[in-house]
Amino acid sequence: MMMASVMQAAEKLDLKSITSGAFSASYVTGINPIEGTDLYASISSDGKQVVSYSFKTGKQVAVLFDVEAAKAPMKSVEGYVMSPDGKKMLVFTKSKAVYRRSFKAEYFIYDIARKTIKKLSEGENQQVATWSPDSRHIAFVKDNNIFVTDGEKEVQVTKDGKFNEVINGIPDWVYEEEFAFNRAFAWNADGTSLGWIRFDESHVKTYSLQLFEGAKPTRSEFHDYPGEYSYKYPKAGQDNSKVSLWSYDMKTGKTLALDVPVDVDGYYPRIKTTPDANSLIVYTMNRHQDDMRLYSVNPFTGKSKQLIQESVPKFIKEEVMENSIVGKKNILLPSDRDGYMHLYLYDMNGKLIRQVEKGNYDVTAIYGMDEKTGDIYFQAAMLNAHDRQVYVAHKNGKVERLTSQEGSNSAYFSGDYRYFVNNWSNYSHPYVYTVRNNKGKVIKTLEDNKKLLEKTKQYNWGKRETFTFTTSEGVKLDGWMVKPVDFDASKKYPVILFQYSGPGSQQVLNSWSTGSMGSGGAFDYYLAQEGFIVACVDGRGTGARGAEFEKCTYLRLGDLESKDQVETALYMGSLPYVDKGNIGIWGWSYGGFNTLMSMSEGRPVFKAGVAVAPPTCYRFYDTVYTERYMRTPQENEEGYKVNPIERADKQHGALLICHGLADDNVHPQNTFEYSEALVQADKDFKELWYTNRNHGISGGNTRNHLLRQITNWFKDKMK
């Protein structure tokens, strides 16, 4: 009786609230450790100030920038970059996304002591503005060209940049998307030279997206006739950009071609500063992405020498480049060469000093190395695959855990490595930010999201239960499920499986970010409120279980992943409280691909499914991602035939496909071609298109509408 009255008093979740951010957590934003100090800077919650805080006390030290006090021509600051000497900062506003990681913005130079502000450059907004190590100059990209300025005089370094032809200092689309970076230049140690990657994409084939007037935002230029956005997108097996390396001498104003060996069709996925003014570090990768090399190149002579070669079976993960560190004395490189992702320490000449730590677990992030003490700070899935803790590895080989609570922990370390800001969460608790010393002791709580936690208790916010089962092939898989709040084990419930399933990904992770649409999995709890059990299982190919588990899908994407989702449906159907005739599946992007693969696997276990923005044949996807896991279509014809289009005649269950017409990542072509295959196979299905929306399908009321269609589809077909 009491339980019933409590449940009746609980407020009901609604999609409008979920998609409008009513359950969004509070963050400590823009955390930026100030180099060589125990201070960090952060943007205030109203975006009006950049404030410095003490790691030691957690207290505010100074206001570094104030929009009103500086009389800055902006409503709020969206981001900032401190100069290395701490005397100035770049602040930017009016940022506008280009692709996933890139943006253009209006940058300003602010002198902290003098409280003066000036525009970085006139004309087109700028990208990736970066201080020189001596704090005297700033390099940035505008209109595909590199510029440098001292705040008074601006020099244009390159002049051949042109949209869809030549790019200087920023990556092309596929490099940005798949090698995960947005700046392709680096200063040398004393700021006397600048090195960069030049992309000649003139011969790369173009893909065009059709644009309409639409709404929110309205594109009035397309009021009567649609327009197009055309850009260079290399598909699997096709030509990539031709890349070359260059340097600019700040004293002479001369440019020089740098000679760093790379295959004709290979990659330059990183360029980095070193402590030696006569050296930049350049990474190279072969097209198969199973051989990576680090070179030291002299920006004044153009000559290079190889330092490190990393070769592993099948492929090198992109995270190896993202997490590697070039320090003052050492280079730290992650590698799964022994079957798990671990850390390897080299000297600046490329000589291996030691393996930093070892065990049957994966290192998942690197936070830095204190070269004074030899301590190395990192994140790892050491307790289990769905847990993340922060650790320190000492020079003597001892590894200590610095975070205390199970769940997901990440860190931002101070410039002197004496303190860090810890961000912790788990399935049921939103983010908690605490300041800790480098022994792990909590000094102060910065944000605990108590208000959000209390709010979730006012709604039908269920509990995410974890489970493990073994497939008919003997594979042990981990999952979670959310049951209706009024769950009755004597009843039978329909089930919706959510999954992503892509290489190295994880959805079964003890974190507030886990769940189909973020916000603590609010959409999952909404579906549970509507009477469904929502479940998720990470199948073969997903991350944090070692190289063998992750790389077993190599050359046949979608084969094992779809089998594991079918096995998940069979397992769920065996539970006494599940209606095995009413099991559905859905996913976004790779999850959409695997939804289609699972619904055509051959065992008709799914009553309904929804595929959002799905790749339907990897010949249509980009070179870097696809070939990393599949090689080229010319080399792996049979592997590429493992796709939803080829098995459209096996598709079963009620199918809804949703796609944005302006998706620059997974092109609408994928859904167009798949729907034609379904038509010819005489299969019923429904399509839903979103005008001018990209891969994220958001803007205005779009996300609310999309989630309502997904919900209603499962309600109509399964209840």
Regions found by a protein language model. Give the residues of each.
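Predominantly five- to eight-bladed beta-propeller fold
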Residues: 15, 21, 58-59, 94-99, ...
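Serine-hydrolase catalytic core recognition
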Residues: 18, 277, 410-719
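Signature of short aromatic-glycine-proline-rich micro-motifs recurring in repeat-based ectodomains
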Residues: 26-31, 75-81, 170-190, 270-271, ...
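Non-catalytic accessory segments flanking enzyme active sites
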Residues: 28-32, 43-52, 62-64, 78-79, ...
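Beta-strand C-termini and the immediately following turn/loop, strongest in propeller blades
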Residues: 41-47, 54, 82, 89-101, ...
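Short loop/turn segments that connect beta-strands within beta-propeller blades
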Residues: 55-58, 111-115, 150-153, 249-253, ...
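Blade-loop segments of beta-propeller domains
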Residues: 59-86, 91, 96, 122-127, ...
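Asp-box/WD-like beta-propeller blade repeats and closely related beta-sheet repeat scaffolds
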Residues: 101-148, 153-184
